Amino acid sequence: MKIKKKNKIYQGKSKIIYSTNNSDVLILKFKKDMSRLNGKYIKKFDNKDIINNKFNYYIMNKISSFNIKTHILSLLSDNQVIVKKLKMIPIEFVVRNYAYGSLLKRFLIKERSFINPPILEFFFKNDGLKDPMINEYHCISFNLISENHIKKIKKILYKINNILKDIFYKAELILVDFKLEFGLFNGDLFLGDEFSLDNSRVWDKNSFKKMDKDIFREQLNENVIESYKEVANRIGCLID
């Protein structure tokens, strides 16, 4: 059955989600928007939607090649992808390989310190509460996720981290940290949402130059879209 777009059901900071003629399938449309200060400042960038869509598709396929289930089905267009409709778990899972960002505000740790083993952090997805950090006990007690699924997700996260660190390292890049989300389809765990330079930090391995959304967040004197494109090309996701 050919998938056809129907109604817009959700619009976030970086994507719009549409229903389709198949109740088990959605369409994600990436946006040109980039935001900082919790969405208070938004700017549009040409080609950002295309880069993020292709980058996400490339990374998700790399991950799925290691027998990790993702929601990705197929590309629909330059800025749209067809995905499985998951029952999303309301938790953001963050993996940290180097000390940067909010970690520096919460702990007395030197910036750019290598973290071994990597730190896993959980954040409850709630804009009104500003996505508070939680632990496994909150997750279980508040019925956000089962203990069994937590164990599986932790194992998957470490596996994904090793996969991605290797991909970036071979491209002379450092994977500093990243955020992922998971959901359920017929009771099975799937990696959902996206992996892009909007929700990860990547530095050049030799110069430590920032090549992700921090360029925009910190108003650095760099072209953020050219950096996104360079990272994509360096890891093998060729962007025109």
UniProtKB/Swiss-Prot annotation:
Gene Ontology CC annotations of this record: cytosol
- Alphabetic keyword roster: ATP-binding, Ligase, Nucleotide-binding, Purine biosynthesis
Q: In which pathway does it act?
A: Purine metabolism; IMP biosynthesis via de novo pathway; 5-amino-1-(5-phospho-D-ribosyl)imidazole-4-carboxamide from 5-amino-1-(5-phospho-D-ribosyl)imidazole-4-carboxylate: step 1/2
Entry-linked SUPFAM superfamilies: SAICAR synthase-like (SSF56104)
Top-level lineage group: Bacteria
Q: GO annotations under biological process? A: 'de novo' IMP biosynthetic process; cobalamin biosynthetic process
Q: Which InterPro entries has this protein been placed in?
A: SAICAR_synt/ADE2_N, SAICAR_synt_PurC, SAICAR_synthetase, SAICAR_synthetase_CS
Principal EC category: ligase
Q: What catalytic reaction does the record list? A: 5-amino-1-(5-phospho-D-ribosyl)imidazole-4-carboxylate + L-aspartate + ATP = (2S)-2-[5-amino-1-(5-phospho-beta-D-ribosyl)imidazole-4-carboxamido]succinate + ADP + phosphate + 2 H(+)
Could you list the residue ranges that cross the membrane?
none
Any one GO MF term held by the record is: phosphoribosylaminoimidazolesuccinocarboxamide synthase activity
Q: What is its EC number?
A: 6.3.2.6
The UniProt entry's sequence similarity note says:
Belongs to the SAICAR synthetase family.
Kindly provide the name given to this protein in its UniProt entry: Phosphoribosylaminoimidazole-succinocarboxamide synthase
Say which species the protein is native to: Wigglesworthia glossinidia brevipalpis
Give the gene that encodes this protein: purC
